Regions:
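Mature, soluble, non-transmembrane domains
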Residues: 108-243, 248
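Sec/Tat signal peptide C-region and signal peptidase I cleavage site
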Residues: 18-30
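Short amphipathic beta-strand and strand-loop transition segments with alternating hydrophobic
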Residues: 58, 98-102, 152-157
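Short acidic, gly/pro-rich beta-turn/loop elements at beta-sheet edges
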Residues: 54-56, 88, 127
Length: 249
């Protein structure tokens, strides 16, 4: 994800990669092979374009008393276009991540406030387990709180000009985006900018939000006119650094 976050992730991956192999270690058991090509309808509370991609803290927000607080509260509505985890098909699976990155994610690993991963009701237990494992690699950070929930992602749609997703008909969550007008009628796309822990993506398609809301529990929030975009990323188990084999006794 963010610039500092990418650097921290890179250091962690490098440290794993350079651990010397030992002749006293047995071969590690084969991990489950997986792959996912996923499109995300995403929005957050930062002004357009989210400064978190270039800094170690989010934009400041002022309350009615004038006090400033830094946070990035976001909704990420995912749909796996094509994917699998071992023999488990993930084609068409939808899930939702609501989160707050907190005020400072300069650590290594980056520490962020909270996240809720909501599985669509149509998902099987095997699909939920698979998505949970894959997301741990997509979001390689330390959350202060990470929980799961279940809901109905009943709207997930987009065109060249707009995108919309709702959780429980909008009662639990909603993201509505509209394309920002560029020099032509084609979408504005930012490429070659890192996104969380994924190694490949097709670019940030800029679409400021008309609304982005998470309407569940004490951490509910709602913003209008702030950052939004769509992105399609691709990742597989082949992209992960191999884990060192356990030492023999």
């Amino acid at each position: 994800m963010r610039k500092a976050l990418f650097a921290a992730i890179a250091l962690v991956c490098l440290a794993i990669a350079i651990v010397p192999a030992s002749t006293t270690r047995a071969a590690a058991p084969a991990a489950t092979e997986w792959a996912a090509n996923t499109t995300v309808i995403e929005a957050c509370s930062c002004p357009m374009f989210c400064q978190c991609y270039f800094n170690t803290s989010p934009a400041g927000h002022h309350d009615h008393a004038g006090a400033a607080a830094h946070f990035c509260r976001a909704n990420l509505a995912h749909r796996i276009n094509k994917g699998h985890y071992g023999a488990v098909s993930l084609d068409g699976v939808k899930f939702w991540v609501a989160s707050d990155l907190g005020g400072d994610f300069s650590g290594n690993p980056p520490k962020m406030d909270w996240a809720v991963l909501t599985f669509d009701k149509a998902m099987t237990k095997e699909q939920r387990d698979a998505v949970g494992e894959i997301m741990s690699h997509v979001f390689p950070v330390q959350w202060g709180s990470f929980t799961t929930a279940e809901g109905s992602i009943d709207v997930w749609e987009y065109t060249k000009d707009a995108a919309r997703a709702t959780l429980d008909g909008g009662k639990s969550g909603e993201v509505k985006l509209k394309r920002f007008q560029g020099m032509t009628n084609d979408p504005i796309v930012i490429k070659n900018l890192g996104y969380w822990g994924v190694p490949r993506h097709e670019g940030f398609v800029l679409m400021p939000n008309e609304v982005e809301a998470y309407r569940v529990g004490p951490k509910a929030f709602e913003f209008k006119g702030s950052n939004g975009f769509m992105i399609t990323w691709d990742m597989s188990s082949k992209d992960l650094a191999p884990k060192p084999a356990p030492a023999k006794n």
